[in-house]
Structure formats: structure tokens, C-alpha cells
Amino acid sequence: DIELIREHIDVIRSCNIDILELGFRSLINDQYKGPLAFTRDDFLEKFDSKNLKIAVMVNIKEFENHNEIKNKINRLFPFDSNNSKVDIIRLACTYEEIDKVKVAYQLLKEKGFEICINIMHGAFLDFKTLKDIANSLKKLPLSAIYLADSTGSMDSIEYNSKLKILAQETNFDIGIHAHNNLGKALDNTLSSISIGSSWLDATILGMGRGPGNTDIEELLISLTPKYRKKINIIPLINHSKKWFEKLKEEHKWGKNRFYFLSAKYKIHPSFIQTMLTDSRYSTAEIIGAIDYLKNDKSRTFNSQKLLKARTFFEGKPRGQDIPKHKIKQERVLLLGNSEGILNFKDKLEEFITYENLYVIGINSKSYISQELIDARVFAHPMRLLADNNLFELLNQLIITPYSMLPEKIKLKLKNNNVLDYGLEIERGSMESLKNYCTIPSPIALAYTLATLGATNVKNIMLAGFDGYPKGDIRNQEVENIFDLFRKKYEKINIYSITPTNYFNVSSKSIYGFNL
């Protein structure tokens, strides 16, 4: 939004802030992103940035090898500093990318730009590594060297001790880029001033991916008495209310219990952000994923690692039971978790009793009488760990990959009747083998259908599978599961007896059966 950016520049300038980092400078263009993902010079020409230094960030990981650095730098910055609206370039890198950042620095310095280097993953760097970094960079006339706490897991004591190493080993200005996972971004930023930090990063309302960063309103309020500078922050607060409050509501940055845990275990916040914005993840599954990721050195985001964390099973796929030996009925009613099922509670209970149906519930929710449910399915171990009512299910068969569960969850099931059927995750696949199945994703519905595929069932009725509103892309994952099932198990009839928005599921009405 041009109006937002123009007003933003004016407000930042009015607060006597020295530098405004407007966005990234990047060559990656594999999905739609706004103009500040690229922050090109022709875009910057639209704005008056007089009396304000404009900075952009470049992520060194874009340079996959040394041979392409010069070409990419020239494409990213075709003009020298005299012909560009950019004053300062911040190069973000990891310890492993120091050699590349030095090459990029030299090329950009020749173009006349001020350069800062932003060292990421500060919580993972010990004193020796920080000294190595400082010694490697200290001959470069940098404007500043930053230490970023990418996982937001450091307190002020640890942060200051590491910043002090950089200050002692170089003559550079020191910068701090704090993340707010633990709610300590402001405290860490203010505390760093005592050891000489002079480049203090902050954003309006703490805006930033996931837990966010230091809140600039709070930082300015805290700094005003210290520096005896009268700063009128009313325009900043008005600007924040006009634009950023609704952005925060939309993008939901800011600390919460999940980001707090990620900081404690030094897990990259993008794992948490991805799960929080994906409706498929329940609270139990997020906690389970964190429990997995904390042991897997998850300082950088990886989508495949997240899929593995979502599964959370131990070892190769295996089980001890053959489903058809424990589920012998030919007609099964599968109960979903949609609250719409409450509209049919009485009718369903009457229908189940009259038809003498074998009833399987997904997880532990109960919208009908417990006595009418024969079995329950748990495809994710954290569903079991989170459920404190399993003792009530002693008369219900628990269908789960028992042999693949962690020991602490096995103990929880010691008094339950269990069908131990293993599972393996393989995209685009559904297959029922002797004592384990292959399914496309760790979803209880997929596991249930694959388990039933290993029995002699002929009819599967669905109730409580309302789905999302028509057109919602979240329906696609479930619809893909139904497609895979129908193709693999052509002889099994499957249909819903309550309303559903899944377009590829046949429907009948519960009211149309003869009672």
C-alpha cells in the first residue's frame, strides 16, 4: 500500500529514528510477494526519504555458491550508492556463510554502500565461534555487526555476554536484533546498551514473523528519559492504530505459549508459525511436534522435518494385530468430530441401536452416548497423551499404532483393549498390509479407512464429517483421502448419512432408512 509506506516514512522520520529498513532485496520470485520483498530502486523512487537512511536486507543463503555471487550482486544492485535510494545494506548470514558474506561485502562496498552484517542463530554460537567470526570480519570497515537471536531464546545476561565478545574483538558498532518468543525482546534490547550496542532494531507493535520483535513504541518510551530527548510519539501511535493493529490481527504475530516453548528448546519460530496457520494442527499435535523438534536441532526451518514431527512415531512401520480378527462386522458407522452431529444425536442413537451397527469414533470426542461406541481411533500419539479420559474407554477398542508409540504413552494404555496396527506415511499412497498400513498424511480419517480396508467390511457410513464451507481449500486434503480410498477399495461402499461439504463423498439421509 503506497499510502501506508509513504505515511510510514514520514512518521519514522518525525520520531528522530536514524534508519528505516524497508524490506528485502531478493531475486527469488517463485510466488506472489509484495514490493517490499524486492524493494527495487524504481519502487523506492516513489517516496521522499530525505533526512532518513534507507536500508534493505539481503539473505546470503540466496547465493548457493561463490561463483554466482558477483552476478547476483550486480543484478540485485545495478546502481551504485550515488544513484540509488538505498543507503545501507544488511547482509544476513549464518556462521557457515561467513566466507560468502565477505565476498558480497567487498562487491557492495565497491559500489559505495554502507554495510552491516547480521549474524543469525546467536543462541547456538559459543564464545569461541563468536571470536572466530569477529576475527574473520574485523578487517572489513563495517558500519555495524549485529547478533540476531533467531530463536528468541536468550536472556539479557547471555545476549550481552555474546555481544560483548563482538565489541571486544572488533571496532565495529554493535547491533541487536531481538525476537520476542520469551517476551524479553525489549529487555534484551535496552540491556544491550550497557555493553555498547548502538544499533537497536525495533518494529511497530513488534511486527515480525511469528513471535515478533522489539516493540518500537515501547523502546522509544523507554529511551526518552535516558537520552533526555523529547520525542513526540503520538503520530507513531496513531499510525500504528490506523494500519498495524489490523495487520497484527490478520497475521497474528506476537508471543504465545507455543513460541515460548520454541524458545526454550531453541526451535526456529517458523515451525510454530506454520503450524498455527494450518488448521490441521490441533493443540496436542503442536505440542507433540515441539516435543519431537526439540531433540532434532531445529534451528532452521524445514517443511519435511515438520511433516516428520507431525507423525512423531518411532521406528519402522509395524504392528502386532490383524484388523479383521478384531473388527468382524460388515457394516461400520464412522463418527467424525464436527459439532453438526449434535443436530442428529437422537436420530443417530436410535439408528445405531436399531441397525446394531459397529461404531468407530475419531479420537475421544463424544457427541453420542459412550455405550454405543465400540472403538476409537488415535493416529497421533499426542492425541493419546493429551486425553485424560482414556480410563473411561476401557470397554472400547483403541485402534492405534501401539508398537510404534513412545513408552510413556504405551503405559497409559496398559489397561485398554488395543488393536495394534502400524502406519507409514507416504504421499499419495493408501494401502492396507497385514499388520500396518500406508497412508498419505497422519490424519485419523486416513488411518481409520486404511485399517478398515484390512477387514471384511462392505459398507462404511459417515456421520459428523461436515467439512469446511464450500470452496475452502482445507477440504482438499480430506477429499484426496476419500479419492485414494475409493480407488484402492472399490468393493467397499462409503457414504455420509449426515450433511457434508466434501464433494466426492456420496450421501444418503439418515431419515431415509427404514426404522
Residue ranges of predicted features:
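Metal-ion/cofactor- or nucleotide/acyl-coenzyme-handling active-site neighborhoods
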Residues: 317-515
